[in-house]
């Protein structure tokens, strides 16, 4: 069986940013709080003594968590700012899907499909290298056209746009039309009937 120290470390690791209270850890490990306190002190000493670990134990308001040592703050701040390590929002995923299937497409055309402004999502997707400007549309104002990049293909794990899942155009149009059915309730009171 694993040592109390290893089991404690595993619990704290899984708890992540939320951390765990003394009481919760004692219950889960089935040990008294005094024994737990000693294990926490040992774990902290282990982290402090090991120059090859980036981890330390943090206690705040009787909640304990495993965090990175303050020495790594600048490195981790720089890492978190890199576009590839930020997740895509739902809006960005919607825009990316629209661009992938309808490319080349203008921002206004994306906005028309979504019903909201997509400028922020387009800028984010460009910063991530997932979409690019693909010329200008021959129309009033000569708006930018957007298309996906080779990195987009790598990002979603395909070799060409031909591998995108086919969307039946009629099914898509039916779904769009059903949103605006004539028999749809005009106000919330009709939903109760």
From Swiss-Prot:
GO terms for biological process: cell division; chromosome separation; DNA replication. InterPro entries: ScpB_csome_segregation, WH-like_DNA-bd_sf, WH_DNA-bd_sf. One of its GO terms (cellular component) is cytoplasm. The keyword Cell cycle applies. Its main location: cytoplasm. Pfam families: SMC_ScpB (PF04079). The keyword Lipid biosynthesis does not apply. It is found in: Cytoplasm. It comes from the Bacteria. Keywords: Cell cycle, Cell division, Chromosome partition, Cytoplasm. HAMAP family: ScpB. Belongs to the ScpB family. Homodimer. Homodimerization may be required to stabilize the binding of ScpA to the Smc head domains. Component of a cohesin-like complex composed of ScpA, ScpB and the Smc homodimer, in which ScpA and ScpB bind to the head domain of Smc. The presence of the three proteins is required for the association of the complex with DNA. Participates in chromosomal partition during cell division. May act via the formation of a condensin-like complex containing Smc and ScpA that pull DNA away from mid-cell into both cell halves. This is Segregation and condensation protein B. The lineage of its organism: Bacteria, Bacillati, Bacillota, Bacilli, Lactobacillales. The gene is scpB.
